[in-house]
Amino acid sequence: MSSSKPSFSDYFGKLGGIPMYKKFIEQFHNVEEFEARPDDLVIVTYPKSGTTWLSEIICMIYNNGDVEKCKEDVIFNRVPYLECSTEHVMKGVKQLNEMASPRIVKSHLPVKLLPVSFWEKNCKIIYLSRNAKDVVVSYYFLILMVTAIPDPDSFQDFVEKFMDGEVPYGSWFEHTKSWWEKSKNPQVLFLFYEDMKENIRKEVMKLLEFLGRKASDELVDKIIKHTSFQEMKNNPSTNYTTLPDEVMNQKVSPFMRKGDVGDWKNHFTVALNEKFDMHYEQQMKGSTLKFRTKI
């Protein structure tokens, strides 16, 4: 573990029993008191599930496919990260309070921690899920490149923490299952990352319908082209390269690394995969939620 990085206990606390960045916990009263507006749209994901991809697609929809409009500012200003509270760059609640409607809100919060005002105002919520094995790989590389976060001892060590729910935002299993239950609400749209990779046109059409927007071939084509992985990886307004190395060191790992389905096969050993599968089966027993780990 790098001596320049703090320990896990220095950096993380618990919020409602869920591991969370201490800086976020200190300001969480502002999140709890957040005043939603009826036309707010909330994008919720467990970390590393395609949040930035979905956010950019929504920005393109809101701007009627105007690429230049979407490039005018970085994604974390256009879609503020609700519970994030950092000294210099992202202050989610403050950004959102100063923003004109309609607002697009990003959050990684589980159901029980999302501000109640979003439910009271009957806001539309989109939850994007991704298979757990690809999430844990992507999450591991994020932890390595975010300078302030303590490094895990190894990939295996991080997978163990992930299975135990001892990573920021807690258990992937509980997070995903609780939002799956909430998707019975017609105001909640539940999407799968794997479906988006397999047939992005179909999923964009689904988003347009959910948002009550008119679809045209021209608009959908523009959205698909602008939000392809390669386009977004090369786009400074979406790839987080505007952040200094002291925040995200992209020399360690790029923020937009691969975006593939099935990359977990390059990182899991046979033994670790068997252990993960057993744990997965226990955690997901009784759930109707099914994921694909390859397409």
UniProtKB/Swiss-Prot annotation:
Substrate binds at residues 106-108. InterPro entries: P-loop_NTPase (IPR027417), Sulfotransferase_dom (IPR000863). GO terms for biological process: estrogen metabolic process; sulfation. 3'-phosphoadenylyl sulfate binds at residues 48-53, 130, 138, 193, 227-232, 257-259. One of its GO terms (cellular component) is cytoplasm. It catalyses: estrone + 3'-phosphoadenylyl sulfate = estrone 3-sulfate + adenosine 3',5'-bisphosphate + H(+); (24S)-hydroxycholesterol + 3'-phosphoadenylyl sulfate = (24S)-hydroxycholesterol 3-sulfate + adenosine 3',5'-bisphosphate + H(+); 17beta-estradiol + 3'-phosphoadenylyl sulfate = 17beta-estradiol 3-sulfate + adenosine 3',5'-bisphosphate + H(+); 3beta-hydroxyandrost-5-en-17-one + 3'-phosphoadenylyl sulfate = dehydroepiandrosterone 3-sulfate + adenosine 3',5'-bisphosphate + H(+). It is found in: Cytoplasm, Cytosol. The modification Phosphoserine is found at residues 216, 228. GO terms for molecular function: aryl sulfotransferase activity; estrone sulfotransferase activity; steroid binding; steroid sulfotransferase activity. Its EC number is 2.8.2.4. It comes from the Eukaryota. Sulfotransferase that utilizes 3'-phospho-5'-adenylyl sulfate (PAPS) as sulfonate donor to catalyze the sulfate conjugation of estradiol and estrone. Is a key enzyme in estrogen homeostasis, the sulfation of estrogens leads to their inactivation. Also sulfates dehydroepiandrosterone (DHEA), pregnenolone, (24S)-hydroxycholesterol and xenobiotic compounds like ethinylestradiol, equalenin, diethyl stilbesterol and 1-naphthol at significantly lower efficiency. Does not sulfonate cortisol, testosterone and dopamine. May play a role in gut microbiota-host metabolic interaction. This is Sulfotransferase 1E1. It comes from Bos taurus (Bovine).
